């Protein structure tokens, strides 16, 4: 649809001045979709959706089969917010193809087409069907013949009023509705009824029954399969769709159905087989699923094959859509839309809903549209259509043509433009105008003419090079086109240039030093100046790297850089950059940092022997200070970190890159590294060399701490410390144990072929108890035998004592302590005695659970503590030595005394007089099961002293002579034959400045009350107040 020229001009001006999001052409939010409407629906209303946005609000029209729908002439039609409502829809009048059209002042767009169809299912016309007569064993087809309908159908059959099930002998085609029986049996005789269901309306109708009877003229013989249900030769299938192929055969015996691809490829695993293989279903169909498929029906009489080609198709799908374009008059427009699909889509173009063809300035080639020298008549709504036989898609865009005179309202010339003397400046002139204007410049009131210094570009910008002071002033840009003239003025200010007076200079420094790189300038003081520094091309971040870098100077014309604690990583190029609003310049300096050498490279083991390794390496960077020496370090699995090693030459100078490491252990895996040094310091070590093992050699190190002793009767036990693996010098390491009776000449030898052996036991009845032997242990490996250790004397195992101790006696010391006495055995022992073992147990316990304590040497008594009071204990004593214990003495019994009193002294009162402290307390009475109180112990100490003094008394008072210049801590407890009883709470008597004082401890009637009191209240009063 073509709009009036005046409306387009007005639209262009409004579009130019308004926000793009405010005014625009129609845009579909929702387009109509196909509708299958059930004729028997109770709703009696159809809605075709069409939702559009635009400003101004678009007007919506509908077309049916290309003809406008007149909603005013037919009350059944109404348009609500763009969507078309049809009341009481009629199959004859309303079925067809609908399309929505949207129009506003910017143009017109049309929607995709949508079909309205009516779903229905009529009743069967006939009420009876002829009887079908077949032989037993014969195949049979019962025709359904569905009545007139619209919408997809599904089929089922009823056999004698019951649903007919499907198996390998029966099949219902969902394409034709027919019932197939591969081989009729006697049980198949009866009435068959076809049931047809419309899947849209769910309406169901039953056909007339068909009687099936068996003929009496014989049984059908065997015959090969005959395929009655087969899929078409070509089955086009959409991408992503689900395709179902049917195949069923009659035959005797009942045929089996097998599916396969003719090209030999396996059928996709996603495929499913139904109804005894009668249906092959392939979901989510893709290009790789296309091909020739075969259905093979086979029985013992033969086989038949049905074939069909599954072809792949895809509706068009956008790869590239078109977008809105806003252009000035006389410019060019190019649109391109791209879609994929199968078959390949073709393209059409619409302008304002009407076909667009190639003519004059408009060139169309497939998905491209080219409009040259655009004018106002080209404005409108454009649509690109991509179409193949399976569908069509739309892409919509708006072409806005701007026609307006020059306007500087949003793009005024810069009010002030700064430039330095000798510099170059461009004053931009960018008014909004369509078509493109012609530009003129003035300086002051004079027209500016171009010369070799002053030029005006095609887009209107003014360029001046080699600026002088005389170029300063006001400049005006004048823009003119068909629709008017406009101008804008700005000022050019010329400033003196900035110059670096003290640039940074290259320096040579040592690691750890600090320096200042100067950067001082002269500049126009009316301009702000900014200093920045870069290091090796990267700006220095003074916040992040403040540990090393700091800006110093203190003047706006100085931007010096201080570098503190310089490291090797700080070597490189430093650039001071100075910037004002009119110029930018820089000055650079190189910083050389001298430091310890870098790590040497490529440390290689050239040759290795049993104790030496020949190494070579390449020097690393010397960091600007010659390397003076190298040190070689080694590491083994047995060393703690890296260790310096001896070399030849002993001192390796900086010009030597090979050395021999000496003093290595044979048959040990080594790795080496090299460290370089110069006058500044020691550098980082090299990467380790490869690991190499030294060659084998005879062992040289003998076992340490050769000793022994102990063991069982007639045994000589010899022990030693194993030789560390790094000192074994080779594989097959072991020990040679040599021993002989003391004073004899001939050695007995035993070989132990284990590097881990550390003990040998010689057992022989001829070995006397505790007799001396000379012992030494040697070493060997695959290379041969090594030395023996020094000879040492080891005693054979001794015999345990043979006689028991005598005269056992025990007595009770308290409720918790017993003392036991015994005498040495009366008869001579064959085994020496190293001490005695006392065994004790309670009467109610078993002897095997007894506790034991040991004495050492000739001690013939011991004290047993931590026992229970009033308990009967049994005791026995044995002599022992390293071979074990001897026979037990006779058992003696002893009963511990009653426990001491559990109640502490209570009601403690104290007073002081003439350097004395007098304590009084209540008498403690023992319980029936406790020992009688024999007296009391008073324990006292200075508050700062750890040692305690004790006074015993059989009274309930005591007098202490103590100086008053210290605080005292005092406790009181009873004692009895059963031991010491419970102690009172501690009483603190403070340092007393007055000669007379009185106080009391907590009053306690039992132990529980005493333990619950956490503080002691002390009151002091002068004697005069008593």
UniProtKB/Swiss-Prot annotation:
One of its GO terms (biological process) is axonal fasciculation. Mainly expressed in brain. Highly expressed in cerebellum and weakly expressed in corpus callosum, caudate nucleus, amygdala and spinal cord. Also expressed in testis, pancreas, thyroid, uterus, small intestine and kidney. Not expressed in skeletal muscle. Isoform 2 is weakly expressed in cerebral cortex. SMART domains: FN3 (SM00060), IG (SM00409), IGc2 (SM00408). Residues 886-896 have a biased composition (Polar residues). Disulfide bonds join 50-100, 144-194, 247-295, 337-384, 429-477, 519-576. GO terms for cellular component: axon; extracellular region; plasma membrane; side of membrane; synapse. Residues 685-710, 886-907 are annotated as: Disordered. Residues 687-696 have a biased composition (Basic and acidic residues). Changing residue 176 to P: In a colorectal cancer sample; somatic mutation. One of its GO terms (molecular function) is cell-cell adhesion mediator activity. InterPro entries: CNTN4_Ig6, FN3_dom, FN3_sf, Ig-like_dom, Ig-like_dom_sf, Ig-like_fold, Ig_I-set, Ig_sub. Residues 1001-1026 form a propeptide. Interacts with PTPRG. This is Contactin-4. It comes from Homo sapiens (Human).
């Amino acid at each position: 649809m073509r709009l009036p020229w005046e409306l387009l001009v007005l639209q262009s001006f409004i579009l130019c001045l308004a926000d793009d999001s405010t005014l625009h052409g129609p845009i579909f939010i929702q387009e109509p979709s196909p509708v299958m409407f059930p004729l028997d629906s109770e709703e009696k209303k159809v809605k075709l959706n069409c939702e559009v946005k635009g400003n101004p609000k678009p007007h919506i029209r509908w077309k049916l089969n290309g003809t406008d729908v007149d909603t005013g002439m037919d009350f059944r039609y109404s348009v609500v917010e763009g969507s078309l409502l049809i009341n009481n829809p009629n199959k004859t009048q309303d079925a067809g193809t609908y399309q929505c059209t949207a129009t506003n002042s910017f143009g017109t767009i049309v929607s995709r087409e949508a079909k309205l169809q009516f779903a229905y299912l009529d009743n069967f016309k006939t009420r009876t069907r002829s009887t079908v007569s077949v032989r037993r064993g014969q195949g049979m087809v019962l025709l359904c013949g569905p009545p007139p309908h619209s919408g997809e159908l599904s089929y089922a059959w009823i056999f004698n009023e019951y649903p007919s099930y499907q198996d390998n002998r029966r099949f219902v085609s969902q394409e034709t509705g027919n019932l197939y029986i591969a081989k009729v049996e006697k049980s198949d005789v009866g009435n068959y009824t076809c049931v047809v269901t419309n899947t849209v309306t769910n309406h169901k109708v039953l056909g007339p029954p068909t009687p099936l009877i068996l003929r009496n003229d014989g049984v059908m013989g065997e015959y090969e399969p005959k395929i009655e249900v087969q899929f078409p030769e070509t089955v086009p299938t959409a991408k992503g769709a689900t395709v179902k192929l049917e195949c069923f055969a009659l035959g005797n015996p009942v045929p089996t159905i097998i599916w396969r691809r003719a090209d030999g490829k396996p059928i996709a695993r996603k495929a499913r087989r139904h109804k005894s293989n009668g249906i092959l279903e392939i979901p989510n169909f893709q290009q790789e699923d296309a091909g020739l498929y075969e259905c093979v029906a086979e029985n013992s009489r033969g086989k038949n094959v049905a074939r069909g080609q599954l072809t792949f198709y895809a509706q068009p799908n956008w790869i590239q859509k078109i977008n809105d374009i806003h252009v000035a008059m006389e410019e060019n427009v190019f649109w391109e839309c791209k879609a994929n699909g199968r078959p390949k889509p073709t393209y059409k173009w619409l302008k304002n809903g009407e076909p667009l063809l190639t003519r004059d300035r408009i060139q169309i080639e497939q998905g491209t549209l080219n409009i040259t020298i655009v004018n106002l008549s080209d404005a409108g709504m454009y649509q690109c259509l991509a179409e193949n036989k399976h569908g069509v898609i739309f892409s919509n865009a708006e072409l806005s043509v701007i026609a307006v005179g020059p306007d500087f309202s949003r793009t005024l010339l810069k009010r002030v433009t700064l430039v330095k003397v000798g510099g170059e400046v461009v004053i931009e002139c960018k008014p909004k105008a369509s078509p493109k204007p012609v530009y003129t410049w003035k300086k002051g009131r004079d027209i500016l003419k171009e010369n070799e210094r002053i030029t005006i570009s095609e887009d209107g910008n003014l360029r001046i090079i080699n600026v002088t002071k005389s170029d300063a002033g006001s400049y005006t840009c004048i823009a003119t086109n068909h629709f008017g003239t406009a101008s804008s003025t700005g000022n050019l200010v010329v400033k003196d240039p900035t110059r670096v007076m003290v640039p940074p200079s290259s320096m040579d420094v040592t690691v750890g030093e600090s320096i200042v790189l100067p950067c001082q300038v002269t500049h126009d003081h009316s301009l702000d100046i900014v200093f920045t520094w870069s290091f090796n091309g990267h700006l220095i971040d003074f916040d992040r790297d403040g540990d090393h870098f700091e800006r110093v100077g203190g003047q706006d014309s100085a931007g010096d850089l201080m570098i503190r604690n310089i490291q090797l990583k700080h070597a490189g190029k430093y650039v001071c950059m100075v910037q004002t609003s009119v110029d930018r310049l820089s000055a650079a300096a190189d910083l050389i940092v001298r430091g310890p050498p870098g790590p040497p490279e490529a440390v290689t083991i050239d040759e290795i022997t049993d104790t030496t390794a020949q190494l070579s390496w390449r020097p690393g960077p010397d960091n600007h200070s010659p390397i003076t020496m190298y040190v070689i370090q080694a590491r083994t699995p047995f060393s703690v970190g890296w260790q310096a090693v001896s070399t030849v030459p002993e001192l390796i100078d900086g010009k030597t890159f090979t050395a021999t490491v000496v003093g290595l252990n044979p048959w040990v895996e080594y790795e080496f590294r090299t460290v370089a040094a110069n006058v500044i310091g020691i550098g980082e070590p090299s990467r380790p060399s490869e690991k190499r093992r030294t060659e084998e050699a005879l062992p040289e190190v003998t076992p340490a701490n050769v000793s022994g002793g102990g063991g069982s009767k007639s045994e000589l036990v010899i022990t030693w410390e194993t030789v560390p693996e790094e000192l074994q010098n080779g594989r097959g390491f072991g020990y040679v144990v040599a021993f002989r009776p003391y004073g004899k000449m001939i050695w007995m030898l035993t070989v132990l072929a284990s590097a881990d052996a550390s003990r040998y036991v010689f057992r022989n009845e001829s070995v006397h108890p505790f007799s001396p032997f000379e012992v030494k242990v040697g070493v060997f490996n695959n290379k041969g035998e090594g030395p023996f250790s020094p000879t040492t004397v080891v005693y054979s195992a001794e015999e345990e004592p043979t006689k028991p101790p005598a005269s056992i006696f025990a007595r009770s010391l308290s409720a918790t302590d017993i003392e036991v006495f015994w005498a040495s055995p009366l008869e001579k022992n064959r085994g020496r005695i190293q001490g005695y073992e006392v065994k004790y147990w309670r009467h109610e316990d078993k002897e095997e659970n007894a506790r034991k304590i040991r004495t050492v040497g000739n001690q013939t008594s011991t004290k047993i503590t931590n026992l229970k009071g009033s308990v009967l204990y049994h005791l026995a004593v044995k002599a022992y030595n390293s071979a074990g214990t001897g026979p037990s003495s006779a058992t003696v019994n002893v009963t511990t005394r009653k426990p001491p009193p559990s109640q502490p002294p209570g009601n403690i009162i104290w007073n002081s007089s003439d350097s004395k402290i007098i304590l009084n307390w209540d008498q403690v009475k023992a319980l029936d099961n406790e020992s009688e109180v024999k007296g009391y112990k008073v324990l006292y100490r200075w508050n700062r002293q750890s040692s305690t003094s004790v006074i015993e008394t059989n009274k309930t008072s005591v007098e202490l002579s103590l100086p008053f210049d210290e605080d005292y801590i005092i406790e009181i407890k009873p004692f009895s034959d059963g031991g010491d009883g419970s102690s009172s709470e501690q009483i603190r008597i403070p340092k007393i400045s007055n000669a007379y004082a009185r106080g009391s401890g907590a009053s306690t009637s039992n132990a529980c009350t005493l333990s619950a009191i956490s503080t002691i209240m002390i009151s002091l009063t002068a004697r005069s107040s008593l």
